[in-house]
């Protein structure tokens, strides 16, 4: 993510997604590998990636590297209302990759309840947090995973270490809400342009995938595409191609 101050207390949020669709052609050898695997599989202490490691390294938004990205920019007023959206295909240079385990030492509920925290990006993180809270309230939905616990497994010298992490931290909410926003907005753009996408919807507790947009009751949005994880889900890679075609006026 990026945050840029604008005039009169407003600011611009950038949601930047790695863009492997710019380099993986449909029906190419790499595309066939991704299509066969469909998604990354996560196992205790290991994972089987959808794409080869060399391709992941090539397209990952790593700090201090100029990388291709599909970005959504939101111009946000001082009351955290979105007043403008713009999608771009671009190259970006990431200043810093922030990691959850180190970030949560500073950016947590306790620090926010005290009114602030010390971090190089404390101002940007605080703005993103307030924006995420506003977006969650607008959807009329809260994160149902707050009380769930994730476990990570590490194997070293034949010894297994299990660590637990409770979901629902401030950084979880920021990432979740901005991903919901970008997937909803890109789904809206595809719908308005009459371009086919793969949509995820929910009604009466049943979730389905379809090429026709429909409301997602669980998230409280009018339409929702999977498009924010094109490195680990094939559906997202397909949708990213459609969004790129829309922006390039190729569809």
Model-derived features with residue positions:
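Electropositive polyanion-binding surfaces
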Residues: 1-251
């Amino acid at each position: 993510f990026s945050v840029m101050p604008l005039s009169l207390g407003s600011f611009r949020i950038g949601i930047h997604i790695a863009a492997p669709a710019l380099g993986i052609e449909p029906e190419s050898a790499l595309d066939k590998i991704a299509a066969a695997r469909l998604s990354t599989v996560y196992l205790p202490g290991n994972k089987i990636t959808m794409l080869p490691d060399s391709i992941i390294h090539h397209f990952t938004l790593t700090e201090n590297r100029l990388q291709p990205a599909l970005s959504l920019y939101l111009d946000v007023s001082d009351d955290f209302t979105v007043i403008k959206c713009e999608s771009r295909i671009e190259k970006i240079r990431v200043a810093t990759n922030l990691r959850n385990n180190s970030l949560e030492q500073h950016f947590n509920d306790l620090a926010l309840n005290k009114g602030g925290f010390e971090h190089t990006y404390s101002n940007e993180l605080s703005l993103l947090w307030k924006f995420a809270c506003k977006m969650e309230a607008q959807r009329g939905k809260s994160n149902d995973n707050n009380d769930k616990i994730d476990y990570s497994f590490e194997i070293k010298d034949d010894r297994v270490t299990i660590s637990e992490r409770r979901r629902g931290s401030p950084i979880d909410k920021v990432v979740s809400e901005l991903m919901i926003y970008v997937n909803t907005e890109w789904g809206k753009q595809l719908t308005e342009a009459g371009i086919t996408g793969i949509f995820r919807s929910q009604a009466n507790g049943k979730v389905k995938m379809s090429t026709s947009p429909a409301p997602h009751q669980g998230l409280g949005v009018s339409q929702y595409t999977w498009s924010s994880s094109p490195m680990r889900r094939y559906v997202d890679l397909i949708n990213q191609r459609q969004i790129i075609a829309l922006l390039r006026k190729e569809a």
